[in-house]
Regions:
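N-terminal intrinsically disordered, acidic low-complexity segments at the extreme N-terminus
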Residues: 1-8
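A residue-level detector for the "anchor" residue at the start of short, highly conserved motifs
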Residues: 8-74, 78-95, 101-254
Length: 254
């Protein structure tokens, strides 16, 4: 027997360039999967960041929290809240994203709600905070509240509203408190908002995603009112009243 055939030839592994290419592809796929988990496409499902919050609500879900004798919170849909360490006896939370109505019922240290780059403080008050984009909106519904951003502060009386973002704290304005409060009664009311704003709001309460592709239609200002539980009926209203064409796709995409 030929000695050269005593042992089968050893198999050679993939070349270094091929191995590096494989590892690079695997790492890219892993990174892509992680990105999808953190930022789901079209927000079709909750992200991993949603599950890190102390308190959260899903799509169309609302929740009430009694965090202390002096702090009661009602959370709206798609909202995340974290508890923060108390400062000198204060009850403190952070609105990470979404919308919440806060009732402060203490006579001592204030309730503090952090949101974005600012904070809202109150002792005896009821106020609404909305943080669904780059801007935070604070509306005072009862009592008075202090809204602070960097070194600036605005004191709001009942019926006043102020917004702030990364650029600064803006001047207070008169608020439509009925519209601000509407979500607590299960309705959504629009009076002169653009159709794009209406669709954004529908997406907060409806599973799936509504995509508005017509720029002229998106800029059109509308007046409408509908129940939170009837978002599909709202889409039919947009079709019948404003000429929107609806195309339904799997996964609740319209």
């Amino acid at each position: 027997r030929d000695p050269g055939l005593a042992h089968p030839p050893a198999r050679r592994g993939p070349s270094r360039p091929a191995r590096r290419a494989f590892l690079g592809t695997a790492m890219a796929m892993a990174a892509g999967g992680a990105a999808v988990a953190v930022w789901p496409p079209l927000s079709l499902w909750p992200s991993l960041l949603d599950y890190t919050a102390d308190f959260r609500t899903g799509t169309a879900e609302q929740r009430e929290l009694a965090l202390s004798d002096q702090l009661h919170v009602q959370m709206n849909t798609q909202t995340r809240i974290n508890q923060r360490g108390a400062q000198a006896g204060s009850a403190a939370i952070e609105l990470v994203a979404g919308e919440a109505q806060v009732e402060a019922a203490g006579s001592g240290a204030p309730v503090i709600v952090y949101a974005g780059a600012g904070a809202t403080r109150a002792r005896q008050a009821r106020f609404n905070l909305r943080y669904t984009g780059p801007e935070v909106c604070v509306t005072c519904l009862q009592g008075t509240v202090d809204v602070q951003w960097a070194g600036a502060q605005r004191t709001l009386a009942e019926g006043e509203q102020v917004t702030y973002d990364d650029t600064g704290l803006h001047a207070p304005l008169a608020a439509d408190t009925a519209q601000v409060n509407a979500w607590r009664t299960g309705t959504l009311t629009f009076a002169g908002q653009t159709l794009a704003e209406v669709v954004d709001e529908i997406n907060r309460y409806r599973p799936g995603r509504v995509l508005l592709r017509n720029a002229d239609l998106a800029a059109r200002r509308v007046r409408m009112r509908f129940e939170i539980t009837q978002t599909d009926l709202a889409l039919h209203m947009l079709r019948d009243l404003y000429g929107a064409q609806l195309t339904r796709l799997p996964g609740g995409i319209v």
